[in-house]
Every structure is written in structure tokens, then in C-alpha cells.
Amino acid sequence: MVCFSSLFVAASAIAGVFASPVDHEQLAKRQSTPSSQGTHDGYFYSWWTDGGAAATYTNLAGGEYSVSWSNGGNLVGGKGWNPGSARTITYSGTYNPNGNSYLAVYGWTRNPQPWLTPLVVEYYVVENFGTYNPSSGATARGQVTHDGALYRLFESTRTNQPSIDGTATFQQYWAVRDVKRTGGTVNMATFFNAWTAAGMRLGTHNYQVVATEGYFSSGSARINVAGGGGSTPSPPSTPSPPTTPSPPPVTPPPSGGGSCAARWGQCGGSGWNGATCCSAGTCQAQNQWYSQCL
């Protein structure tokens, strides 16, 4: 959702008095705020749209921004920091979705497994959403309590989709708040630690914003972001890459009840009480403390 290798080019003027349906579609695209990233009034901002919606994004003073959209398409934008970190974030504002939309702390990381092909991770701490629960169809990874509410953890895979490194296949990490809200405090260390404990490794942080996302829907939001305490965490210590020959795969338990770890997830090791089978790949011991689905 965030490939910024090119900007949209304005179309030529519409000729004639009577516009065709195709003309209307192109006009809607021209009326959208072009995708961009940068710094505004002390905050990093990121705005991306696929051009399919009539969408307007505006940077306001400080950490505040507004966005409105309609007529379909995919878009996401907000203000925050680059790089992301385990900071405590406060935010407030208004959020009025009509259809599929999220309000979330949203960010990206790179290289969660340094010895493998470079990968990216897209993460969401979802505070509010429209008609579609983003955890639908994702794999449950546990739960964590934060700021008086339960957040449910999930993991999903995106295949050949836009990312900070172009089109890629990558993991999505989710923490979805049971009771929706538009305003409060989010301590990102809580969620980074919970994901890591569930075998969902993060890597090196890229940007982190409090974002509004819309997908073939309509709505508006005006959000004010503050915070910044904490520091960019060092990536969790990772086991050394396996030497040749690789250790033999760990035999998964017989099929039955329970769920298996996703690819790249933890599946064993001394003291590990989670899943010991893999929904994709095979469980391979990296050392006595850590086995992983590869």
C-alpha cells in the first residue's frame, strides 16, 4: 500500500460538454491528493492512494491531519515518526467511516529474519474500524491487555502486494482492540513484546504513523497525534543462521486439534509452550532455544 516510486501525472483537460462514465472516473482520480511522504511541522507523514477514490488528505498544525474519501479505491495516511519505536503514543480526534476502514497505529519493519531473503512486515494496532473486522480470516496468535482493554493478536500473509520495498510477499501483524475507541494512549512496547513472544519477529523499524485507512468505502477523519517517548528498540536477539549441514526438521505432532505456526513463526525450543507444527514450511531447530517454521 505504500509504493512511492512515482507520482500521479495530471490528465489532459476534458473536451466537450457531455462527459462519458470513463471521464467521470478519471475526473475523480484527478481530484485526489497525490501520494507523498515527508515531514510537516515536526512530524513525519505518509499518504498513499491507488487513485481509485476521490480522496483528500491535509496536513494540519503539529501532529494533526484530516482525510476524507469516497467512491471506492484503497488509501491510507497519517502522521507520526520515522523510524518507528517502542514509544508511547497519544491521539485524539474524530473518525467517521462508512464501510471498510481502520484507525490504527500503522507501521513497517524490514528484515525480521536477517539471514533470509530480505522481507518486510506491515503492522497494525487497530483502535477503531468500520463494518469489517480486519482480523477476519487471519490466524489467531493470542491476546494482550493494554490501557484497560483486550487486544487480540493475529497474523496474516499478503502475496504480491504493494509494500515499502515495492511489490512483495510479506507478513501482517495485527492487534485489534475489542472495544472501539477514537482517542487514548498506545504504548507500542506492549504490542512489540506481545508479538515477539508469539514468534512474530519485527526487525528494523521504518515509519510509524497513526493512520486512517479506507478500502472501497467512504468516510472522514480528523486525528491529532502526540507522544514520542521511548526509543527505537534494538531488534530482538536472533539465533545465528544455521550452518551446513542444516539441522534435521523437527517432526510435527500428529494432526488433530490446535493451530500451527505460520511460516517464519516459532515452533519449538527449550521452554516453548506454543504451537509445534507449521501451517507452511517445516519446523527446523536453529539452536536448543529456538525452532522456526522455514
From Swiss-Prot:
Name the pathway.
Glycan degradation; xylan degradation
User: What positions constitute the catalytic site?
Assistant: 122, 213
Q: Offer an example of a GO molecular function term for this protein.
A: endo-1,4-beta-xylanase activity
Cite a single GO BP annotation. Answer: xylan catabolic process
Pfam families hit by this protein: CBM_1, Glyco_hydro_11
The cross-references to SMART domains, in alphabetical order and at most eight, read: fCBD (SM00236)
The protein's annotated catalytic reaction(s) are:
Endohydrolysis of (1->4)-beta-D-xylosidic linkages in xylans
Q: Do you know which PROSITE patterns this protein is assigned to?
A: CBM1_1, CBM1_2, GH11_2, GH11_3
Q: Does the keyword Signal apply?
A: yes
Entry GO CC: extracellular region
- Could you say which residues form the signal peptide? 1-19
Q: For the CBM1 domain, which residue ranges apply? A: 259-294
Give the EC number.
Answer: 3.2.1.8
Q: Any idea where the GH11 domain is?
A: 31-226
Top class in the EC scheme: hydrolase
Q: Which UniProt keywords apply?
A: Carbohydrate metabolism, Glycosidase, Hydrolase, Polysaccharide degradation, Signal, Xylan degradation
Q: Keyword Signal on this protein?
A: yes
Q: Which family does it belong to?
A: Belongs to the glycosyl hydrolase 11 (cellulase G) family.
Q: What is the role of this chain?
A: Endo-1,4-beta-xylanase involved in the hydrolysis of xylan, a major structural heterogeneous polysaccharide found in plant biomass representing the second most abundant polysaccharide in the biosphere, after cellulose. Exhibits immunity-inducing activity in Nicotiana benthamiana. Can induce strong oxidative burst, activate the expression of defense-related genes, and increase resistance against oomycete and fungal pathogens in N.benthamiana.
Q: What is this protein called?
A: Ethylene-inducing xylanase 3
This protein's species is Verticillium dahliae (strain VdLs.17 / ATCC MYA-4575 / FGSC 10137) (Verticillium wilt)
